[in-house]
Regions:
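Class I (Rossmann-like) S-adenosyl-L-methionine-dependent methyltransferase catalytic domain
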Residues: 1-39, 43-74, 91, 113-176
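A short glycine-rich, Lys/Arg-flanked "PGG" loop and its adjoining helix->strand segment in the class I
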Residues: 97-110
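A conserved beta-strand element that flanks and buttresses the S-adenosyl-L-methionine
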Residues: 83
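Short catalytic micro-motifs in class I SAM-dependent methyltransferases
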Residues: 86-90
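Short N-terminal helix/helix-N-cap motif within the alpha/beta-hydrolase-1
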Residues: 92-96
Length: 176
């Protein structure tokens, strides 16, 4: 699957805008991002929702799609917090492990926020009702795989489950 084929949230569509802005606002609240002077890496930034919601904060936007990214690579950047919002599901489990290892090597003290699709029947119904049948095209890892890998490498700071029964949010940092 090429970079162009991965789905991107379209904030011009009212159902996607409402839901994903709500998830982004919950991420901001859980990780207390509205009160930070830390540099935030929005990994898989898409249409840069966090830059819009957190004006006047230092947000680094990185995406596999050239039209969205501000940097060719995240590997030479300095950041304190990484947001993975509905992103890891497009990586194979081995790629998630490698990514987290790279992030830890770059900053072993960074915090991470994971917004993760529960990939359940409610998500599928929402895809249909929002006229977005390709929303989960290209998924390479299950909810369970993502959570297992994430918590093998990190420890939980805070969790918010069940955002409309479709998304879980985990705020964590690397294990020692």
């Amino acid at each position: 699957m090429s970079a162009k084929e991965f789905p991107t949230t379209d904030y011009s569509k009212i159902t996607q805008k409402y839901y994903f802005e709500y998830v982004a606002k919950r991420i901001i609240k859980i990780a207390k991002l509205q009160n930070t002077n830390k540099t935030i890496l929005d990994f898989g930034c898409g249409q840069k929702i966090f830059s819009r919601l957190l004006k006047n904060y230092e947000i680094i936007n990185y995406d596999i799609k050239p039209e969205y990214t501000e940097f060719e690579s995240y590997e030479n950047l300095h950041f304190d917090i990484v947001i993975f919002n509905h992103v890891l599901m497009y990586l194979y489990p081995s790629e998630i492990e490698k990514l987290l290892d790279k992030i830890k090597k770059l900053n072993p003290n960074c915090e991470m926020v994971l917004g993760i699709s529960r990939q359940n029947i409610i998500n599928r119904i929402a895809m249909i009702l929002s006229f977005n049948p390709l929303a989960h095209k290209g998924i390479r890892s299950t909810y369970k795989e993502q959570v297992e890998i994430f918590f093998k490498k990190t420890k939980l700071i805070e969790k918010k489950s069940n955002i409309l029964a479709m998304t879980d949010i985990f705020y964590s940092r690397f294990c020692s």
